[in-house]
Structures are given as structure tokens and as C-alpha cells.
Amino acid sequence: MQETAQEYKQRIFGYLAQNDPVKVQAATAKKLGRLISRASASKLRKQPAPGKWSISEILAHLADTEVVVSYRIRAILGAPGTPIQAFDQDKWAQAMSYGKSDPRRSLERFIAFRKANLDLLKSLSPGQWKYHGMHAERGEESIETIAKLSASHDLNHMRQIEKILSQ
């Protein structure tokens, strides 16, 4: 049974605990680079189980998720209370051929998008962190919540990558 949007949010926030989401996000790119630096191309493309993403697919997903996060934050800043559309990550993975993506190029894209997002987050006033949008599945989400979700999402996928590399 698939978890609900609220169950997902609760589970994923557990990875972040009391850590600063901006610091976690700032550290992610280097950690990902270290994790994949010595992995072979075949290891990066190997699915750990049927229907589970390879490291290459995870990296492509992380890069695309940064685009989504970037848009959501900017949309909220431009029009607080704006609707936030959900996206189907599996449909994106299929439509954009994540399985065929170059993992190192995906990491490069992720790094570029992440840097832009961190620059924006660091420029926000305390009041802007409270601006919110209305997520189609999860309801009201502030920029602060989006930053926490993004950091938690990083930690979730890094655990997956570490597990795949240890197999």
C-alpha cells in the first residue's frame, strides 16, 4: 500500500530531525560526488531490485526535483498562497529516460540547480520563509517547509545510494 502525502511528509522529516535544512542541502552535492566517485558505470546503472531506481536514475530525479523546488519557491515568492502542482516522479522518470541518463551529467545539473536554489534561500528575509503555497496533495506548505522537505529528500536518497553501493 502506497503511503499518503502526510505519511510521506512525516517519514521524510524524520531524516532531517533538528538539522538545518540549508546546511544539509549545501553539503549534499559533495557527499553525492564522493559516493559515486569510485563507482563503476555498471554499478551506477544497476537497479537494486525490479521497479527500484538505480543510482543513475536517482541522480536524474534529484536534478529534476531541484527544478521543481526552484519553481515552487519562486512561484510562492511572486504570489503567496499560489497553488503548487504535484508531480508524478515515476512518469517523469519514464518520460525523460532516467535509466539512460549519464549519472555524472545528472550530478552536474543537480549541483547547478542546487546552487541557484541555495543562493535564493540565503537571500530570503525571515518573513519570506513563512510565505506559503497550497500543494495539491499536502495542503499549505511554506518556503521553510519546502526547504525542510528538500533536505529530507536529499537524506532519503543518499541512504538509498549508500545501500545500493554496499550491495
Predicted regions and their residues:
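A glycine-rich, hydrophobic loop/mini-helix early in the fold
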Residues: 27-53
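Compositionally biased, intrinsically disordered low-complexity regions enriched in proline and serine
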Residues: 9, 14-16, 99, 111, ...
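Acidic/histidine-rich alpha-helical segments that form the ligand environment
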Residues: 23-35, 93-130
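Acidic/His metal-coordination segments adjacent to aromatic residues that form catalytic metal sites
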Residues: 15-17, 52, 92-105, 137-145
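Short, contiguous alpha-helical
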Residues: 2-11, 45-89, 118, 130-167
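Extreme N-terminal tail/first-helix region
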Residues: 1-26
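Residues that cap or delimit alpha-helices
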Residues: 17, 40, 125-126
